[in-house]
Amino acid sequence: MFRNLCLFALVIAGGSSAVNAQANAPSSAPISLEEAIRRAQTIETTYSAAVTESVVAQAQRGIARSALLPGVVFHNQFLYTQGQSIPGDQTPSHGGSTSSVRFIANNTVHEYLSQGIVTETIGGAGIADYRRADAEAAAAKARLEISRRGLVSTVVGDYYGVLAADANVAVANRALVEAKRFGKITRQREAGGEVAHADVVRADLQEQQRQRELNDAVLAARKARVDLGVLLFPDPTTAYTLTVGLDQLPPLPSRAEIDVAAKSNNPDVRAAFEVLRSADLEVTSARFGYVPDLSLNYYYGIDAPQFAIHAPDGSRNLGYAASATLDIPVWDWFATRNRVKQSTIRRTQAKAELTITQRRLLASLDELYQEASVSQTQMALLDQSVQTARESLNLTNLRYSAGEGSVLEVVDSQNSLVSAEVSRADGAVRYYVALANLQTLTGNMP
């Protein structure tokens, strides 16, 4: 029983104690919005996957470029072939350059090859593949920017969500203080015979309601801090403070500036365009399957019965050779035609995706700008509402103290002020999030 009473007392006192604990608990260095974004980029796995994809695409571009350049290898080989028996002499020869061998493809029983080989293949498919890899690398880079902007938008929402939650805690705490003050006034007036006991009961109910609201606000603030802490620290429960407030809102750029930035710096459109370019080059590469490839080879080294620069008779084994090969495609059972068909279908799909991406950009741009504009306008109205509600509460308290107002009027004024202050904090977050979402289309991110 004693334990249950202690737990109940802790719950009742939890709101104010949590606020004091937040004010007095040691915390890490203040974190700005830019620092929060930087930390999130080192932890968030989706962004890390986009970084990996971009790096891999850049490496693939280098591989495709290397395929266009001559390749050099140092080839070393030893061949042993069974010798051919000579009539009248059952002992096969094992060494001379004129020894007969059983496999006509080989030159002698012992053959040593040590050569530097330079190989170059000239074909349109290789050039198209390189340009395609370049387009895919550009598309991966654009997708990385999409992921970065999405992460920034998430961090901005969570960052200002924490600020709004802290503001709601402050509002709930002030409301509790006001409710306690009003309860004290009602009890004093009841003792003086000025009001009925019903006013005291109503004031007590109001105080209890404010205590519950403070407890809920503290819990919501704790959850908001943990949600942001997941993106900032290995331990999400690490204490921290934020450097930005909700008092000074950044200005909203003009619609003309937004339109220009969105057309020139939108990663979604850029990624879709690069995907289309890659698909177009894939068609070109597939069509080069109908065109011959020219291979050039140059050899320098030895191909001799001895592993030596000079033969036993003093002649030099070192020498060079060159070859040119032209492979003309004749018949491949329609494999090339099917590859062209596949790539053409993918190109058509890429064109459709680019078109719908451009349409979505126009629609999202208008929608998000209107959201940010309305949010900015409402912030001025919310500021006026807070001032009006605060003035109304002061006047109502004076009327009640003078015996001209009722307890219900005071309670209603208190509720109006709390609602206005909470709405202002939520309105500030709404504007920041709307501005961040708009900036994801224009590239003007922190």
Question: Which ranges hold each PLM region?
Answer:
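Bacterial N-terminal signal peptides
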Residues: 6-15
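Amphipathic alpha-helical coiled-coil scaffold segments and their short linker/junction regions
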Residues: 37-41, 93-101, 195, 199, ...
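A glycine-/polar-enriched beta->alpha junction
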Residues: 38-48, 55-71, 115-132, 142-149, ...
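Short segments within alpha-helical structural elements
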Residues: 66, 209-236, 386-444
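Periplasmic alpha-helical coiled-coil/stalk elements that build and connect Gram-negative outer-membrane
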Residues: 150-263, 371, 375, 416-417, ...
